[in-house]
């Protein structure tokens, strides 16, 4: 048999190396035994895990094997922190010869159940069939209902069959289904999200940024053999980030593969019902290397103030909008940008200095990814540069 025992504090070569990578912990303990007679058994604990943006008090794992398979109990326990309430996340699972299941539970500091939902999987003759349970799972502290005959079947030939409908009484939920009546397409599946309240999900995603809004989305995938298509549409209504209202947003696009192994994408962004950006492009892979990209992106009254909530400590505040078209060509990792951008009433405010800068409305040329501010004026007050 195999026996592995590890006990580690915060001061050793491994801990010191992890500290250089921005990861530290208070104590690590592991005790695992494996033998032909008793199988795999053991436990592990990690205390005081810290990164730049994450602090977790306890992470644990317990594994026991018996005649029915391998049983696992794992989780994260975290006490109250500034701006973050305590929580307890538990993962309970079992892996047998022909089946497996995993159950997730989330409790807050008051032991209120924010999440209670599981997935079971059965090995079938030609694939794996999965099912969501129980019939009334809990999400965002509310009861949901999943259809009794729900399933997601992953076939050996790569096809997916699904019939999953998970919703609550308010219409919030998820649908994932395939069109089995389509005799032409090899694959025809759709995923839909409806009335997802971002503010509610902050209660079960501890380190999620302060966001509010309502999400609706739909993605459709069709594979008819020689041709395939992916289309998607994402809507965020009444969006707020860190308390700043950013309006209504819609992002959509269509992806099509070409006959010469090229990839075509057409996408758009709308803000408060008006299209503010459009992208159309082709990616051509190469037999060696990274391939080449050729795309055009057009801006029409793209508002710059939407970037303000994402600036750390509000060091700067932008206003105004931009118009124009840019072409992107070359290596997808570092394409060259060329084109022209028109700045419309663009201002740049630095609160700490109480300084306001107003940019000239003259078009700015972009040449090989460099903005050419030739004979370009920046005003601080009045009309004098």
Predicted features by range, described:
Residues 1-218, 224-385:
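Interface amphipathic segments
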């Amino acid at each position: 048999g195999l026996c592995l025992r590890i006990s580690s504090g915060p001061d050793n070569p491994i801990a010191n190396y992890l500290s250089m990578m921005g990861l530290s912990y208070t104590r690590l303990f592991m005790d695992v035994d494996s033998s032909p007679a008793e199988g795999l058994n053991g436990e592990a604990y990690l205390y005081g895990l810290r990164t730049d943006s994450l602090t977790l008090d306890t992470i644990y794992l317990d594994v026991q094997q018996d005649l029915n398979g391998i049983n696992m109990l794992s989780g994260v326990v975290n006490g109250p922190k500034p701006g973050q309430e305590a929580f307890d996340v538990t993962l309970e699972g079992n892996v047998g010869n022909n089946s497996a299941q995993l159950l997730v539970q989330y409790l807050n500091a008051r032991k209120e159940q924010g999440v209670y939902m599981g997935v079971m999987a059965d090995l079938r003759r030609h694939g794996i069939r999965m099912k969501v349970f129980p019939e009334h799972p809990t999400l965002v502290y509310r009861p949901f209902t999943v259809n009794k005959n729900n399933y997601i079947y992953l076939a050996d030939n790569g096809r997916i069959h699904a019939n999953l409908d998970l919703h609550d009484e308010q219409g919030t939920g998820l649908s994932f289904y395939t069109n089995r009546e389509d005799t032409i397409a090899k694959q025809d599946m759709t995923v839909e999200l409806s009335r997802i309240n971002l503010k509610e999900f902050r209660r079960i995603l501890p380190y999620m940024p302060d966001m509010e809004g309502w999400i609706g989305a739909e993605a459709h995938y069709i594979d008819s053999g020689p041709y395939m298509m992916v289309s998607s549409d994402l809507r965020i209504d009444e969006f707020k980030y860190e308390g700043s209202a950013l309006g209504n947003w819609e992002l959509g696009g269509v992806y099509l593969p070409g006959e010469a192994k090229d990839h075509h994408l057409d996408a758009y962004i709308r803000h408060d019902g008006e299209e503010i950006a459009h992208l159309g492009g082709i990616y051509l892979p190469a037999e060696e290397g990274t391939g080449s990209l050729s795309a055009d992106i057009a801006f029409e009254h793209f508002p710059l103030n939407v970037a303000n909530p994402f600036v750390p400590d509000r060091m700067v505040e932008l206003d105004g909008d931009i118009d124009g078209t840019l072409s992107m060509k070359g290596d997808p990792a570092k394409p060259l940008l060329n084109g022209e951008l028109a700045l419309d009433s663009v201002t740049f405010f630095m609160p700490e200095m109480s300084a306001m800068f107003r940019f000239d409305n003259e078009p700015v040329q972009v040449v090989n990814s460099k903005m050419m501010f030739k004979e370009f004026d920046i005003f601080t007050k009045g009309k004098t540069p």
